[in-house]
Amino acid sequence: MKFTLEDQVVLITGGSQGLGKEFAKKYYNEAENTKIIIVSRSEARLLDTCNEIRIEAHLRRETTDEGQVQHKLAAPLDLEQRLFYYPCDLSCYESVECLFNALRDLDLLPTQTLCCAGGAVPKLFRGLSGHELNLGMDINYKTTLNVAHQIALAEQTKEHHLIIFSSATALYPFVGYSQYAPAKAAIKSLVAILRQELTNFRISCVYPGNFESEGFTVEQLTKPEITKLIEGPSDAIPCKQACDIIAKSLARGDDDVFTDFVGWMIMGMDLGLTAKKSRFVPLQWIFGVLSNILVVPFYMVGCSWYIRKWFRENDGKKAN
C-alpha cells in the first residue's frame, strides 16, 4: 500500500501541536483532494490550529482568506472544505466511539490515520505524582490503543494505512523517562501484534528522536541533568524537517521510521522476535550484532557508572 498525501481522508490525533499539527499543514498545503480531521482534547487549540493552517496557506498562495469557516466536524458538511477538527478525549474509549460514529455518519471514515498524540514529563521516578504517572499511560498508550481498535472494527475489509508514533526511548529506555518510555514500548509491542492480525492494514511505526515543538520546550523544564547527560548533545531538529523525513520514508515503503541515524542504530541493536521494516535491514542486523558484541557491553558499564556517580553526588535530589 503506497503512502500518498493525495486523495485521502486522514485522521490525525494530537493534531493541535507538534508533529500532528505539522502533518496537518503538510496535507493541507501539498494535497488538493484530501480531507483532514485533526483531533485533540482542547477545542480552542484545535480551532486556533485550523485557522492558522488556513490563513498561512492563503498568505503563501497570495489569495484572499474566505473569513470565518466552520471547521468543527458536524452536519451539514461543506463538500468544498478540506480541514476539520473534532474535540475528543482519546484516552476515554466511549469518546473515541463517539468520534467514529460521527465519522461514519458523515461518510468520512479515514483511509489513513496518524496517531501522534503523546507527551513526556521527564523526571526521576520518585519525583512523579500519581496524576503524572496515569497521564503517561493515558496520553501515550491508551489514545493510540483506543483509536486503533475503533479503526480495526470500522475497516474490516478495506485497506487502511495506520501510522503510529512511538519514540526512540521505546528502543532504549533510560533514567528520567519512567513516565513515558514504558508506554512507548507498549506501543512498539502493539504494532508488532497488529501487523500480524490486521492483514488488510499497512501499519507503520515512527520512532522520532528530539524535534522542536511546544512539548519539547516544556520537557526541558523538568528533565534531570543525568537524563541530558545520557542523551548527549543531540540537537532537536525543526518539526517540519522531522515531518518531511517521516513522509519521505513512508513514501519509500519503510514501516519502521526514524528521524535520525541514532534511532536507526538503536533499532539494529534491539534484536528480538519482531520483523524489522526499516531501510537497509540486512545492514542494520549486521550492525546490531557487531555492536551488541563489541560496543554495548562497554557502553552499558560506562552508563551505569555515570548514573551511580551522579546519584552519589546528588543524593539530596533523588526525588527531583
From Swiss-Prot:
Positions annotated as active site in the UniProt record: 166 (proton donor), 180 (proton acceptor), 184 (lowers pka of active site tyr)
Source organism, top-level taxon: Eukaryota
Gene: TSC10
Free-text disruption phenotype from the record: Inviability of the knockout mutant is rescued by addition of phytosphingosine (PHS) to the growth medium.
GO molecular function, one term: NADPH binding
EC number(s) from the headed UniProt entry: 1.1.1.102
Gene Ontology CC terms: cytoplasm; endoplasmic reticulum; endoplasmic reticulum membrane; lipid droplet; mitochondrial outer membrane
Binding locations of NADPH: 14, 16, 18, 41, 45, 89-90
Motif GXSXG boundaries: 14-18
Organism: Saccharomyces cerevisiae (strain ATCC 204508 / S288c) (Baker's yeast)
GO BP annotation list: 3-keto-sphinganine metabolic process; sphingolipid biosynthetic process
Family, per entry: Belongs to the short-chain dehydrogenases/reductases (SDR) family.
Keyword terms, alphabetized: Endoplasmic reticulum, Lipid metabolism, Membrane, NADP, Nucleotide-binding, Oxidoreductase, Sphingolipid metabolism, Transmembrane, Transmembrane helix
Job description of the protein: Catalyzes the reduction of 3'-oxosphinganine (3-ketodihydrosphingosine/KDS) to sphinganine (dihydrosphingosine/DHS), the second step of de novo sphingolipid biosynthesis.
Annotated membrane topology: Multi-pass membrane protein
Enzyme class: oxidoreductase
Pfam families, per database record: adh_short
Lumenal-side positions: 276-279
PANTHER family in the cross-refs: 3-KETODIHYDROSPHINGOSINE REDUCTASE
This protein's pathway: Lipid metabolism; sphingolipid metabolism
Signal peptide start and end residues: none
Protein name as it appears in the record: 3-ketodihydrosphingosine reductase TSC10
Reactions performed catalytically: sphinganine + NADP(+) = 3-oxosphinganine + NADPH + H(+)
Annotated localization: Endoplasmic reticulum membrane
Residues where NADP(+) binds: 11, 19, 89, 180, 184, 213
